[in-house]
């Protein structure tokens, strides 16, 4: 049952009955105040702060305001003093008409928390109006045969004041024939009747003139007068008589104009002109004459303007039937106006709380009242809003409602709500009114900036100029205003050895990244760091993204020749036997490039040669080979210039210089060696002979094997000492130079040679070939394995 009651309170449609709804939002009872009408603007009614038990500052802090029906500003509330003051002169007659007492209902609306205080102000009447007759002159025709005691109706006066200030009685100037009586209608209005005291004599006095005075009960009293002119007529035996002394008729307020609502009828027993009857309104007010029209012949009473139940719900109309002799009869028509549903409901907005923070819970967004001028079911009202909105209507006090949010809102999903409040009455047909309220949702910093990518990869070519824009990061924030303003920063690198602050910087406003210095691919190929994005909300929210910077290689390094050495010392000389076949490997140029990729792809070509066409260079690996058979006519010494070029743009290059010496054979030394060299060679030869002799005479296989191994080990040790050459600095024709393999040739082509120049004989000698039968077998294998060997060379 409790859950059902909760659902009932949160229903979107609430039936409003114009009755007082007591609750926690309202005061326990209405406070009543009074003030006399016509008081000047600013007149003090009461001190609300004192009456409500609040401090003046609290009254202002809670946004106290006065709410009146129809949103009329009759009052003003001073937040400085807490006084309730008149905002304008109040005219009781204008506000309430004849209704007494005259009560103005108003509410004091307090917020934080929401509270209604119901109040009422009674407007006390002052005697500011005099009685007024509808006709300043009345003309009566009375037969001289009229009997004393006959009552003759007179036109009444009206006084807009009420109570004792209203019209109280009538008087007439003293005379011997008439006196006046004061009568009261059912609605309390007073009217006069003229009573004949003494028979009239036309021959003695054919006309009389009297003054009728209307007096109110004010202090001092006010009065109004009308002149009565009486004409004494000859005898007319019968006066007209109505079929009914009272007609009652109910008329719908939407009855069309010129509709006949009632027909009165009178008869006269006389004949001739004395029996001819005409009908007329008897001392009717201006409002009656504007609303109805009476046919003087037929007695049909028609509407001449639309009725309005909400303004006047009944009329009392006096009708006079007069014959040709001046005699008359009187009847009364009471018109009851029947309410129809012709007024749509009205909404009066008291306050709107907009914008509201998106993280606020159940919050009062608006306070409004509804009303309908109709009565009964026509004035009962039902309120509703759309079902798909996070709001509901909550009835408070009397005819007031509050529009309340169901909970926290999400500005990023929807920042503005146009709420249509539909008010429908229960009449037939039902009338409805729609009222739109716009509620704005203000932003709360509940969204952190979000990068467009979780990681960014940037490419920067080395040797860039400092302050170069290398890329950008971007983050967006779904919030608005300052909560969505993003600033960027570099976060401390995870690698403590990375000098990030000297490598890159970031523009805090737009996320542009800049290189602070020229980058060197050979020193730093790549690095990564984190970038933070922080909004300006309170508290600030942030996020981060990873940035990888890849340095692209530029062709900024020339090839470097490792072999042959180009250090300006003794040049390297390669020996080539004259018996070498075409394609014989002379040497190999070895070079490296500090760049990477295609910038480090090297190609070789023979740039210059002493004898063109004799040697060629393999373009891809730098091998220098013979291009044809050698002959005795070929010079013994050759100088080659090999160009090493990379594949960069633009390409870079280096030049290697080779010296080649053609020799007849390797069996005899070409040049004399130092004295120590022959002795070493002979000792080595004797050792070999000794090993062979011992091996041949050995009778035991095991002993021979062991001895052979020992001799071989001894041979290798001595061969190492014999192979060393002294390499002094200086030009080629000088001391011995070591031109043993530098590691750039394959093991098959490694050898050692010692050369000397000067006064010795022009001979050379191979001290020790590392691999026996090198020349014959190596050249033969090259020629047989690759018949198109020559095609892979580049000749110059």
From Swiss-Prot:
| Annotated InterPro entries | Cadherin-like_dom, Cadherin-like_sf, Cadherin_C, Cadherin_CS, Cadherin_N, Protocadherin/Cadherin-CA
User: Residue ranges of the Cadherin domain?
Assistant: 35-133, 138-242, 247-347, 352-451, 456-561, 568-671
Q: Which topology term describes how it sits in the membrane?
A: Single-pass type I membrane protein
Q: Which residues lie on this side of the membrane: Cytoplasmic?
A: 712-796
Look up the domain of life of the source. Eukaryota
Name any Gene Ontology BP term.
Answer: nervous system development
Q: Name its cellular compartments.
A: Cell membrane
Sorted alphabetically, the keyword list is: Calcium, Cell adhesion, Cell membrane, Glycoprotein, Membrane, Repeat, Signal, Transmembrane, Transmembrane helix
Protein name per the record: Protocadherin beta-3
This chain's source organism reads Pan troglodytes (Chimpanzee)
């Amino acid at each position: 049952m409790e859950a059902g009651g909760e659902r009932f309170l949160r229903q979107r449609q609430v039936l409003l009955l114009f009755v007082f709804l007591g609750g926690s939002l309202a005061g326990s009872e209405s406070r009543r105040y009074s003030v006399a009408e016509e008081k000047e603007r600013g007149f003090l009614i009461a001190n609300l702060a004192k009456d409500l038990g609040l401090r003046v500052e609290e009254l202002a802090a809670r946004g106290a305001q006065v709410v009146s029906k129809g949103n009329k500003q009759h009052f003003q509330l001073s937040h400085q003093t807490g006084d309730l003051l008149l905002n304008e002169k109040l005219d009781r007659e204008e506000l309430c008409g004849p209704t007494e007492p005259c009560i103005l209902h108003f509410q004091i609306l307090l917020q934080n928390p929401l509270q209604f205080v119901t109040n009422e102000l009674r407007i006390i009447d002052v005697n500011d109006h005099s009685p007024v007759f509808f006709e300043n002159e009345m003309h009566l025709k009375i037969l001289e045969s009229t009997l004393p005691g006959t009552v003759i109706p007179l036109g009444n006066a009206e006084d807009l004041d009420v109570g004792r200030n209203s019209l109280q009685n009538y008087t007439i100037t003293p005379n011997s024939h008439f006196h006046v009586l004061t009568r009261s209608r059912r609605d309390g209005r007073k009217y006069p009747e003229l009573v004949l005291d003494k028979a009239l004599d036309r021959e003695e006095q054919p006309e009389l003139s009297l003054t009728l005075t209307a007096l109110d009960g004010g202090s001092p009293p006010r009065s109004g007068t009308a002149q009565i002119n009486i004409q004494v007529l000859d005898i007319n035996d019968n006066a007209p008589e109505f079929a009914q002394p009272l007609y009652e008729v109910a008329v719908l307020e939407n009855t069309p104009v010129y509709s006949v609502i009632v027909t009165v009828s009178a008869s006269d027993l006389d004949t001739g002109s004395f029996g001819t009857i005409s009908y007329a309104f008897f001392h009717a007010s201006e409002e009656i004459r504007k609303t109805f029209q009476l046919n003087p012949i037929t007695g049909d009473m028609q509407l001449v303007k639309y009725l309005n139940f909400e303004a006047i719900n009944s009329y009392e109309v006096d009708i006079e039937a007069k014959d040709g002799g001046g005699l008359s009869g009187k009847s009364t028509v009471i018109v009851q106006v029947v309410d129809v549903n012709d007024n749509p409901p009205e909404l009066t907005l008291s306050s709107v709380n907009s914008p509201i923070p998106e993280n606020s819970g159940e919050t009062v967004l608006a306070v409004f009242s509804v009303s309908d001028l109709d009565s009964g079911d026509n004035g009962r009202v039902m309120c509703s809003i759309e079902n798909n909105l996070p709001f509901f209507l909550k009835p408070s006090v009397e005819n007031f409602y509050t529009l309340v949010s169901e909970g926290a809102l999400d500005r990023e999903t929807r920042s503005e709500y146009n709420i249509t409040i539909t008010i429908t009455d229960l009449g037939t047909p039902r009338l409805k009114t729609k009222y739109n309220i716009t509620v704005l949702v203000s932003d709360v910093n509940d969204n952190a900036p979000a990068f467009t990518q979780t990681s960014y990869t940037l490419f920067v070519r080395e040797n860039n100029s400092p302050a170069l824009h290398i890329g950008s990061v971007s983050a967006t924030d779904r919030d608005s205003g300052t909560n969505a303003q993003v600033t960027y920063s570099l976060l401390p690198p995870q690698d403590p050895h990375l000098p990030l602050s000297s490598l890159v910087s970031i523009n805090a406003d737009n996320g542009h990244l800049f290189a602070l210095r020229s980058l060197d691919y050979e020193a730093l190929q790549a690095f990564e760091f984190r970038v933070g994005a922080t909004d300006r909300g309170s508290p600030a929210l942030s996020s981060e993204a990873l940035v990888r910077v890849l340095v692209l290689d530029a062709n900024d390094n020339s090839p470097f020749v490792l072999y042959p050495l180009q250090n300006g010392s003794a040049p390297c000389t390669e020996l080539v036997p004259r018996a070498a076949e075409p394609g014989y490997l002379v040497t190999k140029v070895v070079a490296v490039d500090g760049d990477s990729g295609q910038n480090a792809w090297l190609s070789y070509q023979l740039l210059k040669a002493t004898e063109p066409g004799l040697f060629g260079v393999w373009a891809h690996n730098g091998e220098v080979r013979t291009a044809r058979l050698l002959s005795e006519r070929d010079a013994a010494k050759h100088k080659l210039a090999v160009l090493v070029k990379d594949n960069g743009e633009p390409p870079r290059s280096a030049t290697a210089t080779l010296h080649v010496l053609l020799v007849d054979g390797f069996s005899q030394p070409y040049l004399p060696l130092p004295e120590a060299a022959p002795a070493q060679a002979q000792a080595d030869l004797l050792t070999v002979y000794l090993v062979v002799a011992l091996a041949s005479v050995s009778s035991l296989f095991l002993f021979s094997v062991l001895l052979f191994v020992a001799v071989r080990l001894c041979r290798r040790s001595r061969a190492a000492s014999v192979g060393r050459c002294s390499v002094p600095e200086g030009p080629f024709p000088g001391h011995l130079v070591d031109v043993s393999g530098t590691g750039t040739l394959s093991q098959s082509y490694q050898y050692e040679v010692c050369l000397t120049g000067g006064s010795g004989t022009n001979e050379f000698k191979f001290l020790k070939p590392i691999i026996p039968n090198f020349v014959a077998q190596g050249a033969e294998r090259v020629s047989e394995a690759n018949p198109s060997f020559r095609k892979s060379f580049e000749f110059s």
